[in-house]
Amino acid sequence: MKAGHLLWALLLMHSLWSIPTDGAIRNYYLGIQDMQWNYAPKGRNVITNQTLNNDTVASSFLKSGKNRIGSSYKKTVYKEYSDGTYTEEIAKPAWLGFLGPLLQAEVGDVILIHLKNFASRPYTIHPHGVFYEKDSEGSLYPDGSSGYLKADDSVPPGGSHVYNWSIPESHAPTEADPACLTWIYHSHVDAPRDIATGLIGPLITCKRGTLDGNSPPQRKDVDHNFFLLFSVIDENLSWHLDDNIATYCSDPASVDKEDGAFQDSNRMHAINGFVFGNLPELSMCAQKHVAWHLFGMGNEIDVHTAFFHGQMLSIRGHHTDVANIFPATFVTAEMVPQKSGTWLISCEVNSHLRSGMQAFYKVDSCSMDPPVDQLTGKVRQYFIQAHEIQWDYGPIGYDGRTGKSLREPGSGPDKYFQKSSSRIGGTYWKVRYEAFQDETFQERVHQEEETHLGILGPVIRAEVGDTIQVVFYNRASQPFSIQPHGVFYEKNSEGTVYNDGTSHPKVAKSFEKVTYYWTVPPHAGPTAQDPACLTWMYFSAADPTRDTNSGLVGPLLVCKAGALGADGKQKGVDKEFFLLFTVFDENESWYNNANQAAGMLDSRLLSEDVEGFQDSNRMHAINGFLFSNLPRLDMCKGDTVAWHLLGLGTETDVHGVMFEGNTVQLQGMRKGAVMLFPHTFVTAIMQPDNPGIFEIYCQAGSHREEGMQAIYNVSQCSSHQDSPRQHYQASRVYYIMAEEIEWDYCPDRSWELEWHNTSEKDSYGHVFLSNKDGLLGSKYKKAVFREYTDGTFRIPRPRSGPEEHLGILGPLIRGEVGDILTVVFKNKASRPYSIHAHGVLESNTGGPQAAEPGEVLTYQWNIPERSGPGPSDSACVSWIYYSAVDPIKDMYSGLVGPLVICRNGILEPNGGRNDMDREFALLFLIFDENQSWYLKENIATYGPQESSHVNLKDATFLESNKMHAINGKLYANLRGLTVYQGERVAWYMLAMGQDTDIHTVHFHAESFLYQNGQSYRADVVDLFPGTFEVVEMVASNPGTWLMHCHVTDHVHAGMETIFTVLSHEEHFSTMTTITKEIGKAVILRDIGGDNVKMLGMNIPIKDVEILSSALIAICVLLLLIALALGGVVWYQHRQRKLRRNRRSILDDSFKLLSLKQ
């Protein structure tokens, strides 16, 4: 026996010993099957209890016809079977719909998926949240693997594959996470189309001891476990579209698959594949623990706010009654239902609500006595009236920021404020909630500090333990109501109309009064992790879409006991501001006809420009004001300011609320922007340290351009004592130049074409990358920030190694709290540019000075405490810098870069972090080249010879210039994302852009931690315009892996790249060293004679071979005995596990044998 043999025996023992012995092997037999699916099996709108003949909206989706498919579609789904014969299907709860079966495991477990494809095309199964190697990833893309490692990437019809997943500690729920984390699995050959076809299911990974030993296992810690997928399922993307047209359309030949109305009819706004309340009832017992596992999937329109009427949820330690869900977002919510009855779950995005994304859940008393709320506080009375008014969106008549008239032709605002025979102008009939002193409704309540509320109703305030009594008087011409968030109420005080088996006296008809009673028991108020007061909203829900667009919405504040003073205001806060960000769609208002009549519009002109007219009625407002017409928000330097921010509207109402000049804290995390979605509410705290006049605006480029701006003023007040001045020290200087270059978004198409196994013309990327048929291709002239070694700007700092991945981005600028960052900027471009940074304290309060072509300017950025990490943040936070001469056009031209600010002591002298081994900054942005300063030059350079023939408004041309990029690269053309196994990696994830820049970024094979007061586990990070996130990872899984945005259109458009985890070079050198040392121990000769020094003794050479063989034999024998004993222990332990697992591999093997005999 050679010495090396002993080494390999030792390594074998190590590998066997490393197999998890404390967890179960959980076998799942899944078959992929075609089936017929009905989105509305009850054949009606269950929410309103209307037939399809009486519901024009529901019938537009659900009635089949000459060129309409209707409610039934062929789909392909995962089904579970009892064993490898795939003959006995295991039933699942009806409410799971077309979702695959629940897969569940604990930390330490192994999941074996025995997948067989009974369908007509290749599919796979790819998981989130678990560990897998290359042969079990289930995702098709060029990753450098081959042979058996590719068998999992595409299981052909009739084929099968066994996927091996595990849940090691590196993928375990953290201490702060709930007992079980929500994940999904889905097919990943062409993931968007596979998922739209139906191949998706739920997966949970749990902490040890959470699951019992039953088959299937049940959770010990909850009484009910529900899984809900919120998705606009696009049947136009299904692999079965042609089959569905042929089967369900009465005249298939008449179908135009490109017709917009036909495509809309195939987009099913579903919960688990059911629409308009057709989801089978979700039943639970009051006062029992319920786990809700919520997840989303889909496209840019898949922005969902799930509202649970009547109950309160707990998500990551915070109380809420809504959950925000996006494509590949996973939410675990906990509930202990208190109020029995049939309650509504709905997506509160207006278009989704109207299109049927609603379901019921039923809370039964289950013989339990109803809980007695501990209400020891006040009864707070509010007298609120709905009053019709004429509302002016621009009362001062000019843009408060620029001073230009709102009606100046070509100014931008004139689109909304110029009155003509085809435009209403800026004044509309609306309805508003107004506060009165008592039930006589004679004397209004006037409070000077609430003048900024604008169209909003009065602020309703309460503390834990209080009862709120609202007397509502409807003096409007339509039935209206008041529906609250964030409080408890009985059925007779709910303001939403739906078919729950009760009457609805709480919708007030015209000139009718109704009274609502809401309560704030302890289990509904702010938690220990919440701020002192939580921001909520109330609104009319007789017809939620039309009521709120008409103006009926107001703020509600729920505080901890003792947080409100005698005057009803929050203690410890100097200023409170309530801001609603929404696009008021006056086309959806109850008063649309009245407004058109009042405007004396010409119907002929309207019919010629319907789209333009409707667009002019969509008012991008803050509290009902556009273009900085909101009454100015005044505060003093050093004040504690509470910003109560509210969102409302439809899927385009994705708002990144930016506070120019100062930063805010959100749950202890430092932010420059706060994200709002329909029916989401945020409390942000600011302590302004930067006097001046600043903007509040929505970061989504189009929203800001369309007027979603306001002004706040920070004054140096004599009554305020200055806080101790922060000490700064000059420390870091960057030399940055703006230069114009040719940029290629996709220099190599081989990855893209191999991925899709297609030609250039048939690839999804053709529209973006082809330079034929009037398109520009992948090359564009751009301006970029580049770093130089010194102020001569002669020697560029090379981009290699750690900075190779930056791509189009400028250099990664780093600083610590207390630093002064000096940026020497030279503009070598052909037009004026500047450098403006988020988060820092800029020395020039009027905004950064622009550098003319050839000019050199120096910018100074101070880094105060409020620019660095908050108490709940990671050690570093990410920001962004860009040219701000024209922020939108400058950024799309290419001038953008990352900025990182760290706590003191984190950065090394060379700028790197001492707590991380690698840092990567990634910008996910749809570069809209149509808005670049260089569009005309690019058309002339890269377009057709007759560039004057290019139609700049052509839809295909416009789409072709929208580059769905990661650091300016498409289809895995970004280079430099390489780490070694075991390294600590910080990812600075950045997003800017428009409301379509919703990016849910998924890391294959790795999970990461993100900070939100505590550490939480995830493998998808959500990004929106103006959000900058930091996630941290310990790279654990060697291989080349995919990273991509999970939004359907973004996947196909190329927003994906690969990152590589390499094994440590030390692994090989260590093994080599061990081998050499063993060899030395066996054959090392004594220098002076014919003996060998071995085991401390001089042994004659002639006896060495015999002794060596004997020693090795003894070692091997002892090793075998140890292995045998260990194997017996392991076998007994495993047998106990397997006896509790009826689907074990051994049992199934015997079943198969008996069937064959």
UniProtKB/Swiss-Prot annotation:
Disulphide bridges: 180-206, 285-366, 533-559, 636-717, 876-902
Binding site for Cu(2+) 4: 304, 347, 352
Binding-site residues for Cu(2+) 2, renumbered to this chain: 128, 186, 1046
Binding annotation for Ca(2+): 134, 152-153
Residues given in the record as Cu(2+) 6 binding sites: 999, 1045, 1050, 1055
Membrane-topology descriptor: Single-pass type I membrane protein
Any one Gene Ontology molecular-function term assigned to this protein's record: copper ion binding
EC identifiers of the protein: 1.16.3.1
Residues binding Na(+) 3: 768, 777
Residues exposed to the Extracellular side: 19-1109
Binding site for Cu(2+) 1: 126, 1002
Spans through the membrane: 1110-1130
Residues binding Cu(2+) 3: 188, 1004, 1044
Record's signal peptide: 1-18
Keywords: Calcium, Cell membrane, Disulfide bond, Glycoprotein, Ion transport, Iron, Iron transport, Membrane, Metal-binding, Oxidoreductase, Phosphoprotein, Repeat, Signal, Sodium, Transmembrane, Transmembrane helix, Transport
SUPFAM superfamilies: Cupredoxins (SSF49503)
UniProt subunit comment: Part of a complex composed of SLC40A1/ferroportin, TF/transferrin and HEPH/hephaestin that transfers iron from cells to transferrin.
Family from the record: Belongs to the multicopper oxidase family.
Protein name: Hephaestin
